[in-house]
């Protein structure tokens, strides 16, 4: 079991100081504000809360599901655990801090878990159920029929989007989708449906796609090398930073642009495209041709850098000025000196400029985990197909 978490301010991720107060419930807890799927507090018999210290409280489900999930976390996070497979599995789960019960209701037991979103300013969150079967081997015929009818394509697709919450830059707000959105996705619309999670209203966040692929591939590697456990109706929780000003200490693209562009030259409404979390700008009157040209210029800058510079120094201005690509750009589409100012941004982009976004992918929901002596083929199938879809989005 992990050590107690540091105390955190109890404010919904992405909220501001002016947000209305959240009603406090048992022991000062509040409903989890950024939950995208699963049992909702106040709507279902059991639900998910947030503790004043920032951890997530998941109420145990009725037997046998609740005790089974508790047993899973207890086994994986046992202090004396020496099983290499389970120790490796910890890397892909939320940290577990034991159980918690409110003083006024000691018989209500909650799992105390890490809030995977806590380090993000504007967390974009997606819950994806993995596997070809969303029912376990001991399910009744009625339960099997119920689960199959919810999403008949589960066997073929291998995963189901249960919900998502995406931050949109232009409106400073979140777009949410529930389980009905995922159930409506077909083989033909699956790619577009998943890509919606990575679109911030201005552009497709390919940096977040790439980061997510890396995380899922590590989980796949774990599954391909273990024959101890089989998972049913379990999910992956995807999280990435939706803000242009992440909470981490890493420099961000808006900061870079602000360093080199004169005050007032660009506004938030001017964002046109972004490439690997880099924002490109133009006036609405200029049309999309400017953004495409600037995108090409930025790509050319990166290629020139990789080809001619092995050190960490940035390109000199005169190097790129000699490139005819800049001369071929349509000047009548540009306002004033924006192009030359954007050139300066490109020149000063440091090497390895945040190619991969800040992102997390964690396994959640373990009420249907069973001992096994074979590879979990259903889960592996789902992971591989999900990776294929993500790669298709990245390559589009």
UniProtKB/Swiss-Prot annotation:
Residues 1-22 are annotated as: Disordered. SUPFAM superfamilies: SAICAR synthase-like. This is Inositol polyphosphate multikinase. Its cofactor is Mg(2+). Inositol phosphate kinase with a broad substrate specificity. Phosphorylates inositol 1,4,5-trisphosphate (Ins(1,4,5)P3) first to inositol 1,3,4,5-tetrakisphosphate and then to inositol 1,3,4,5,6-pentakisphosphate (Ins(1,3,4,5,6)P5). Phosphorylates inositol 1,3,4,6-tetrakisphosphate (Ins(1,3,4,6)P4). Phosphorylates inositol 1,4,5,6-tetrakisphosphate (Ins(1,4,5,6)P4). Phosphorylates glycero-3-phospho-1D-myo-inositol 4,5-bisphosphate to glycero-3-phospho-1D-myo-inositol 3,4,5-trisphosphate. Belongs to the inositol phosphokinase (IPK) family. The modification N-acetylalanine is found at residue 2. Pfam families: IPK. Substrate binds at residues 65, 129, 143-150, 179. It is found in: Nucleus. Its main location: nucleus. The lineage of its organism: Eukaryota, Metazoa, Chordata, Craniata, Vertebrata. The modification Phosphoserine is found at residue 19. It catalyses: 1D-myo-inositol 1,4,5-trisphosphate + 2 ATP = 1D-myo-inositol 1,3,4,5,6-pentakisphosphate + 2 ADP + 2 H(+); 1D-myo-inositol 1,3,4,6-tetrakisphosphate + ATP = 1D-myo-inositol 1,3,4,5,6-pentakisphosphate + ADP + H(+); 1-octadecanoyl-2-(5Z,8Z,11Z,14Z)-eicosatetraenoyl-sn-glycero-3-phospho-1D-myo-inositol 4,5-bisphosphate + ATP = 1-octadecanoyl-2-(5Z,8Z,11Z,14Z-eicosatetraenoyl)-sn-glycero-3-phospho-(1D-myo-inositol 3,4,5-triphosphate) + ADP + H(+); a 1,2-diacyl-sn-glycero-3-phospho-(1D-myo-inositol-4,5-bisphosphate) + ATP = a 1,2-diacyl-sn-glycero-3-phospho-(1D-myo-inositol-3,4,5-trisphosphate) + ADP + H(+). One of its GO terms (cellular component) is nucleus. Pathway: Phospholipid metabolism; phosphatidylinositol metabolism. A motif (Nuclear localization signal) lies at residues 300-310. Keywords: Acetylation, ATP-binding, Kinase, Lipid metabolism, Magnesium, Metal-binding, Nucleotide-binding, Nucleus, Phospholipid metabolism, Phosphoprotein, Transferase. Binds two Mg(2+), but the interaction with the protein is mostly indirect. Changing residue 127 to A: Shows weak but significant activity toward the substrate 1D-myo-inositol 1,4,5-trisphosphate. It comes from the Eukaryota. One of its GO terms (molecular function) is inositol-1,4,5-trisphosphate 3-kinase activity. Its EC number is 2.7.1.140, 2.7.1.151, 2.7.1.153. It comes from Rattus norvegicus (Rat). Residues 1-13 have a biased composition (Low complexity). ATP binds at residues 58, 114-116, 127, 365. GO terms for biological process: inositol phosphate biosynthetic process; inositol trisphosphate metabolic process; necroptotic process; neural tube formation; phosphatidylinositol metabolic process. Highly expressed in kidney, and at lower levels in hippocampus, brain cortex, cerebellum, heart and lung.
């Amino acid at each position: 079991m992990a050590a107690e978490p540091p105390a955190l301010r109890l404010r919904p991720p992405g909220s501001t100081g002016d947000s209305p107060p959240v009603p406090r419930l048992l022991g000062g807890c509040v409903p989890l504000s950024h939950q995208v799927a699963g049992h909702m507090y106040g709507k279902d018999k059991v639900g998910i809360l947030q503790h004043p210290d920032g951890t997530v409280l998941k109420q145990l489900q009725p037997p046998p599901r609740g005790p089974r999930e508790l047993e899973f976390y207890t086994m994986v996070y046992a202090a004396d655990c020496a099983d290499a497979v389970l120790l490796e599995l910890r890397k892909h789960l939320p940290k577990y801090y034991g159980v918690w019960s409110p003083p006024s209701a000691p018989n209500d037991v909650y799992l105390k878990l890490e809030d995977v979103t806590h380090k993000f300013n504007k967390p974009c969150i997606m819950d994806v159920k993995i596997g070809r079967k969303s029912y376990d081997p001991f399910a009744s015929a009625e339960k099997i029929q119920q689960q199959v009818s919810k999403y008949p394509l589960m066997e073929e697709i291998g995963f189901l989007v249960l919900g998502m919450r995406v931050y949109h830059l232009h409106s400073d707000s979140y777009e949410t989708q529930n389980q009905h959105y995922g159930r409506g996705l077909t083989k033909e619309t699956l790619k577009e449906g998943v890509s919606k999670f990575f679109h911030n209203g201005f552009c497709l966040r390919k940096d977040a796609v790439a980061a997510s692929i890396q995380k899922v591939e590590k989980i796949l590697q774990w599954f391909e090398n273990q024959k101890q456990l089989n998972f049913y109706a379990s999910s992956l929780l995807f999280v990435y930073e939706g803000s242009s000003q992440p909470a981490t200490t890493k420099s961000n693209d808006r900061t870079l642009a602000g360093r080199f562009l004169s005050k007032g030259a660009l506004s938030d409404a001017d964002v046109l495209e972004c490439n690997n979390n880099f924002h490109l700008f133009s006036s609405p009157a200029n049309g999309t041709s400017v953004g495409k040209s600037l995108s090409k210029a930025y790509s050319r800058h990166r290629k020139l850098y990789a080809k001619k510079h092995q050190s960490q120094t940035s390109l000199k201005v005169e190097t790129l000025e000699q490139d005819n690509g800049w001369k071929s750009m349509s000047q009548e589409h540009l306002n004033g000196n924006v192009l030359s100012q954007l050139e300066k941004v490109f020149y000063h982009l440091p090497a390895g400029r945040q190619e991969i976004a800040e992102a997390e992918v964690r396994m959640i929901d373990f009420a249907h985990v069973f001992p096994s002596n074979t590879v979990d083929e259903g889960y592996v199938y789902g992971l591989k197909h999900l990776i294929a879809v993500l790669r298709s989005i990245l390559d589009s």
